[in-house]
C-alpha cells in the first residue's frame, strides 16, 4: 500500500513535470517565432533603407559630377580668358571681381596680367570688349581665318574690290574651309551700318553660308588718343593712326583666334592670285618644323602674314604692351628678336635666327592696289615687285592682223604688244563710240574668240557694255544665211551701219564664244564700246583661233 502510494505520487510528479515542460517548450517556441519575425522585419527595413541610401548616393554622385563638369568648364574659360582665348566670354569679364586687383581686399595676393592691365579704360563699360556689330554665322573649326581691318578713307574705298578678289579666287571646297572676317574699325554707328549693309547687299550668299563675317568694335574699346606722346619724329596724328592700327589688329586677332588653325592678316586694298588659299595651306603644312612663327606671302607691310592661331595670344599680349610706342611691323620684329636673338652675338647671327621663325614665300600671292592711305592726306604707290603678272599663254599665236584703236594708250602698254601676247593693253577712260579693231591681212575663218579685260593688279579696269563684232568678207550669200534663221525676217545678229555683225558681248570683263561658220571668211573683228566708262581699261588677253 505504501508502495502503491509512492508509485502514484511519482507518476503524478512525472506527469506534472512533463506537462510543465511541454507548456514551457510551447511558450518558448512561440516566443522564438515572434523574435524571428521581428528580426526578419528589421532586416527588410534595413535593406529598404540601404537601397534608398544607395539611390540617394547615386543621385548625389550625379549632381557632384555635374558640379565638377561646371567647375572644369569655368576653369577652362578662365584659363582661356587669361591666355587671350575664349572670345565668347568677354562679355562677362568685368563681372568677375578677381579680374580687378584693386577691388581685392588682400593686397599681398599675386595677380596675373590681363588685357585690363594694358587697357584699364575697358573696365568702365561692360560692353567694351563686345563687338558693336556682328554679322555672319559665327563659323568655327576651319583651316584658315583671314582678317581684314578696314577704316574710313577720304577719297576711295577698296574694300568691296578686295572682297571680290579674295572670294572669286576660292574654290567651293575652300569656301567651306575658311572664314573672312572684316573689321570695320570705326565707331561712328552710321558709317559702320552703311558699310555693313553694303557688304550684306553685295555678298548675301557668302554671309549666309558663313564664309564672310563683319564686325566692328565697341566705341568704348579705344582709349583717349589725345594723351599720346609723339615719338620717332612722327606728328601726333600719325602717332594716333599707328596706335589705333595696333589696337585694330589686336581686336581682330582676339576675335578670330578661336575660329581656325591658321590666321592670315590682310588689308582692305589688295588683290589675290588664283589658288592663293591652297598655296598658303600647303606651304604651311610642308614646313619641316613647327618652330616657325610668321609665314609671309607678300613683302609689303602687314599683308599676307600667316600665324598659327595658338600663337595669337602671345602676339596680342606683346602688341598691347607696346601699342603706344611703335608701329606693328617693328613690334613683330621685336617679338622675333626677343625669342631667338642673343645680345652677345652680332646682327648677322640674329638675322639668321629670325629667318627660322619668319619664312618668306615667293612669288607673292597678294598685291597692294590702293593709292589713298587710311592716314588722311597720305598717297602711297606701294607695289610688290615679287607679285608678277598673269602668265600669258605663249603657246597660241594670233593670226596676222593690223591692230588699231581710238583709245589713248597709257605709256608703253600698247595694243600691238597685247595682240602679240607680250604684255597687256592699257588705255585711258573709254567713251561711247570708241573701238578696238583687228583687220586681218588675209580674210580668214575664225572658230572662236576670247577676250579678258582687267588684270589681277587692276581688276576694276574692265570693259563694260562692249560688243564683239565681225565684218564678213565680200560674200553676200554667207552673210544672208547668217542674218536670217529659216524664213524668219528677224535678225539673228544685230548689224551696225558700217556692216559689222554683233556676235557677242562682255560680261564681268570677259567675252568669249564661237564664230558661226556661215559667216565664211572674215575681214575684221572689232570691239565696240557702247557707253562711257568710269574707269580706265586693260585688255589683258586676246585669243583668236583660226578655223581648221
From Swiss-Prot:
Q: Which residues form a coiled coil?
A: 36-83
Asked if the keyword Methyltransferase belongs to this entry, the reply reads no
| Keyword tags | Coiled coil, Glycoprotein, Glycosyltransferase, Golgi apparatus, Membrane, Metal-binding, Signal-anchor, Transferase, Transmembrane, Transmembrane helix
Q: Which compartment or compartments is the protein found in?
A: Golgi apparatus membrane
**E.C. code:** 2.4.1.145
Membrane protein topology class: Single-pass type II membrane protein
Q: Please cite one Gene Ontology biological process associated with this protein.
A: protein glycosylation
Q: Which residues lie on this side of the membrane: Cytoplasmic?
A: 1-7
User: What does the PTM comment of the record read?
Assistant: N-glycosylated.
Q: Identify the domain of life.
A: Eukaryota
GO cellular component terms, A-Z: Golgi membrane
Q: Which residues are glycosylated?
A: 87, 103
Lumenal-side positions: 29-548
Family matches, as InterPro entries? Glyco_transf_54, MGAT4_A/B/C_C
* Catalytic activity as recorded in UniProt: N(4)-{beta-D-GlcNAc-(1->2)-alpha-D-Man-(1->3)-[beta-D-GlcNAc-(1->2)-alpha-D-Man-(1->6)]-beta-D-Man-(1->4)-beta-D-GlcNAc-(1->4)-beta-D-GlcNAc}-L-asparaginyl-[protein] + UDP-N-acetyl-alpha-D-glucosamine = N(4)-{beta-D-GlcNAc-(1->2)-[beta-D-GlcNAc-(1->4)]-alpha-D-Man-(1->3)-[beta-D-GlcNAc-(1->2)-alpha-D-Man-(1->6)]-beta-D-Man-(1->4)-beta-D-GlcNAc-(1->4)-beta-D-GlcNAc}-L-asparaginyl-[protein] + UDP + H(+); an N(4)-{beta-D-GlcNAc-(1->2)-alpha-D-Man-(1->3)-[alpha-D-Man-(1->6)]-beta-D-Man-(1->4)-beta-D-GlcNAc-(1->4)-beta-D-GlcNAc}-L-asparaginyl-[protein] + UDP-N-acetyl-alpha-D-glucosamine = an N(4)-{beta-D-GlcNAc-(1->2)-[beta-D-GlcNAc-(1->4)]-alpha-D-Man-(1->3)-[alpha-D-Man-(1->6)]-beta-D-Man-(1->4)-beta-D-GlcNAc-(1->4)-beta-D-GlcNAc}-L-asparaginyl-[protein] + UDP + H(+); an N(4)-{beta-D-GlcNAc-(1->2)-alpha-D-Man-(1->3)-[beta-D-GlcNAc-(1->2)-[beta-D-GlcNAc-(1->6)]-alpha-D-Man-(1->6)]-beta-D-Man-(1->4)-beta-D-GlcNAc-(1->4)-beta-D-GlcNAc}-L-asparaginyl-[protein] + UDP-N-acetyl-alpha-D-glucosamine = an N(4)-{beta-D-GlcNAc-(1->2)-[beta-D-GlcNAc-(1->4)]-alpha-D-Man-(1->3)-[beta-D-GlcNAc-(1->2)-[beta-D-GlcNAc-(1->6)]-alpha-D-Man-(1->6)]-beta-D-Man-(1->4)-beta-D-GlcNAc-(1->4)-beta-D-GlcNAc}-L-asparaginyl-[protein] + UDP + H(+); an N(4)-{beta-D-GlcNAc-(1->2)-alpha-D-Man-(1->3)-[beta-D-GlcNAc-(1->2)-alpha-D-Man-(1->6)]-beta-D-Man-(1->4)-beta-D-GlcNAc-(1->4)-[alpha-L-Fuc-(1->6)]-beta-D-GlcNAc}-L-asparaginyl-[protein] + UDP-N-acetyl-alpha-D-glucosamine = N(4)-{beta-D-GlcNAc-(1->2)-[beta-D-GlcNAc-(1->4)]-alpha-D-Man-(1->3)-[beta-D-GlcNAc-(1->2)-alpha-D-Man-(1->6)]-beta-D-Man-(1->4)-beta-D-GlcNAc-(1->4)-[alpha-L-Fuc-(1->6)]-beta-D-GlcNAc}-asparaginyl-[protein] + UDP + H(+)
Record has Glycosyltransferase as a keyword: yes
What cofactors are annotated for this protein?
a divalent metal cation
Question: Which molecular function term from Gene Ontology is one that the record holds?
Answer: acetylglucosaminyltransferase activity
Question: For this UniProt entry, which segments traverse the membrane?
Answer: 8-28
Q: In which pathway does it act?
A: Protein modification; protein glycosylation
Role description: Glycosyltransferase that catalyzes the transfer of GlcNAc from UDP-GlcNAc to the GlcNAcbeta1-2Manalpha1-3 arm of the core structure of N-linked glycans through a beta1-4 linkage and participates in the production of tri- and tetra-antennary N-linked sugar chains. Prefers complex-type N-glycans over hybrid-types. Has lower affinities for donors or acceptors than MGAT4A, suggesting that, under physiological conditions, it is not the main contributor in N-glycan biosynthesis.
Entry similarity comment: Belongs to the glycosyltransferase 54 family.
Q: How does it assemble?
A: Interacts with SLC35A3.
**Name of the protein described by the UniProt record:** Alpha-1,3-mannosyl-glycoprotein 4-beta-N-acetylglucosaminyltransferase B
Source species? Mus musculus
Amino acid at each position: 500500500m505504501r508502495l502503491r502510494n509512492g508509485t502514484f505520487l511519482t507518476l503524478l510528479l512525472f506527469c506534472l513535470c512533463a506537462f510543465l515542460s511541454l507548456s514551457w517548450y510551447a511558450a518558448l517556441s512561440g516566443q522564438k517565432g515572434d523574435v524571428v519575425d521581428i528580426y526578419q522585419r528589421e532586416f527588410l527595413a534595413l535593406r529598404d533603407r540601404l537601397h534608398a541610401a544607395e539611390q540617394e548616393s547615386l543621385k548625389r554622385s550625379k549632381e557632384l559630377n555635374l558640379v565638377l563638369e561646371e567647375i572644369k568648364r569655368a576653369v577652362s574659360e578662365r584659363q582661356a580668358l587669361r591666355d587671350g582665348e575664349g572670345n565668347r566670354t568677354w562679355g562677362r569679364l568685368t563681372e568677375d571681381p578677381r579680374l580687378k586687383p584693386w577691388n581685392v581686399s588682400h593686397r599681398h595676393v599675386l595677380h596675373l596680367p590681363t588685357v585690363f592691365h594694358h587697357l584699364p579704360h575697358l573696365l568702365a563699360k561692360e560692353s567694351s570688349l563686345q563687338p558693336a556689330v556682328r554679322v555672319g554665322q559665327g563659323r568655327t573649326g576651319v583651316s584658315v581665318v583671314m582678317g581684314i581691318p578696314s577704316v574710313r578713307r577720304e577719297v576711295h574705298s577698296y574694300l568691296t574690290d578686295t572682297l571680290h578678289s579674295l572670294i572669286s579666287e576660292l574654290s567651293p571646297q575652300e569656301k567651306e574651309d575658311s572664314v573672312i572676317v572684316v573689321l570695320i574699325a570705326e565707331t561712328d554707328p552710321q558709317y559702320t551700318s552703311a558699310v555693313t549693309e553694303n557688304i550684306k547687299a553685295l555678298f548675301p550668299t557668302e554671309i549666309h553660308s558663313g564664309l564672310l563675317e563683319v564686325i566692328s568694335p565697341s566705341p568704348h574699346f579705344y582709349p583717349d588718343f589725345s594723351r599720346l606722346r609723339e615719338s620717332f619724329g612722327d606728328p601726333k596724328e600719325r602717332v594716333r593712326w599707328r596706335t589705333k592700327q595696333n589696337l585694330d589688329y589686336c581686336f581682330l586677332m582676339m576675335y578670330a583666334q578661336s575660329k581656325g588653325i591658321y590666321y592670315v592678316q590682310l588689308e582692305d586694298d589688295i588683290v589675290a592670285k588664283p589658288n592663293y588659299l591652297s598655296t598658303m595651306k600647303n606651304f604651311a603644312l610642308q614646313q619641316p618644323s613647327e618652330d616657325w612663327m610668321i609665314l609671309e606671302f607678300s613683302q609689303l607691310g602687314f599683308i599676307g602674314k600667316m600665324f598659327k592661331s595658338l600663337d595669337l595670344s602671345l602676339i596680342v599680349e606683346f602688341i598691347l604692351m607696346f601699342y603706344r610706342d611703335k608701329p606693328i611691323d617693328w613690334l613683330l620684329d621685336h617679338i622675333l628678336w626677343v625669342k631667338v636673338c642673343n645680345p652677345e652675338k652680332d646682327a648677322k647671327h640674329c638675322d639668321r635666327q629670325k629667318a627660322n621663325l619668319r619664312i618668306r614665300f615667293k612669288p607673292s600671292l597678294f598685291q597692294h592696289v590702293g593709292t589713298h592711305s587710311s592716314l588722311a592726306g597720305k598717297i602711297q604707290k606701294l607695289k610688290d615687285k615679287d607679285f608678277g603678272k598673269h602668265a600669258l599663254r605663249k603657246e597660241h599665236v594670233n593670226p596676222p592682223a593690223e591692230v588699231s584703236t581710238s583709245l589713248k594708250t597709257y605709256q608703253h602698254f600698247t595694243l600691238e604688244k597685247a595682240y602679240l601676247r607680250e604684255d597687256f593693253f592699257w588705255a585711258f577712260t573709254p567713251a561711247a563710240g570708241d573701238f578696238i579693231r583687228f583687220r586681218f591681212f588675209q580674210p580668214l575663218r575664225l572658230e572662236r574668240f576670247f577676250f579678258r579685260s582687267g588684270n589681277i593688279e587692276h581688276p576694276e579696269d574692265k570693259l563694260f557694255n562692249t560688243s564683239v563684232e565681225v565684218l564678213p568678207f565680200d560674200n553676200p550669200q554667207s552673210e544672208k544665211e547668217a542674218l536670217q534663221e529659216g524664213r524668219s525676217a528677224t535678225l539673228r545678229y544685230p548689224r551696225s551701219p558700217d556692216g559689222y555683225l554683233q556676235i557677242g558681248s562682255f560680261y564681268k570683263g570677259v567675252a568669249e564664244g564661237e564664230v558661226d561658220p556661215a559667216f565664211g571668211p572674215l575681214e575684221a573683228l572689232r570691239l565696240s564700246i557702247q557707253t562711257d566708262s568710269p574707269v580706265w581699261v586693260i585688255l589683258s588677253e586676246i585669243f583668236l583661233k583660226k578655223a581648221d
